[in-house]
Amino acid sequence: MLFRSLEPNKDIGLFYGHLSTAPGNFLEDMIVYRYDKVAEEPPADQPEIGEPEGVGLKRVIINLAKWGSVFQELKWFTEKTLEPKFESCTVARTSAMAQGEACLVTRNNPMHDSVPYLFNDLSDETDILHEYFIPRAAYNPFIAQAREILRNQSLPVLNASVRIVHKEDVALTYAPEPAYSLVLYINQPTDADGNARMRALTRALIDVTLKHGGRFFLPYQLHYTGKELLASYPELPAFLASKRQYDPTELFSSTFYRAIKALSGVVP
């Protein structure tokens, strides 16, 4: 796989894949973004990060993509063909060979620019972020099954990305071994029916993740069951026991903490 072959390259500063959400090649074709290191420090005249360009147009396109296959295909066409031609540069356009990919940027630029246009301020709907961490050897069978789940449900998938994840040695790790992460951005109505559909979809994706030895990211939505929670994070009871040991009065608490404690079945 391309990701596996490029990961050891220390000259790459940022690398990820953006999957198609168009029906014709849904979660099959991918745009790969690669940023090579040219210096450890930015040049002295590097501009400060400002407001990203084209946010309004990008948001219009992503909103249109909720309305069916024609607009989803249009979104993929603009991402694959048009956006690279209009990316802003911090060096002269002639020096950048008239290609957005050839621009000199800091690592913060691509990470910053992707956020504002994803913000949904429309009433009666919202966009929900999902992330699933899959052992690398299991990624191909996982994505095949995830693709079928997502195709056979009614909520619009607005964005899908794949990123490399290294082993994380923390108490509640989402990556006990090297993994690939599937990041999804899914639109839903905010009424009871929309919440029910999102809950069912989330649980289906969690179940296929667990089937392939993966884990889901805890904080996004509390749509998982206690069984799914403990299957994904078997360390949770020990974590909660340590929490009680060092904080017996539960001075440090939150709605999220109380929710996962209740789901885990741990006695208060």
Per-region residue spans from a language model:
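Noncatalytic alpha-helical scaffold of FAD-dependent oxidoreductases
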Residues: M1-P268
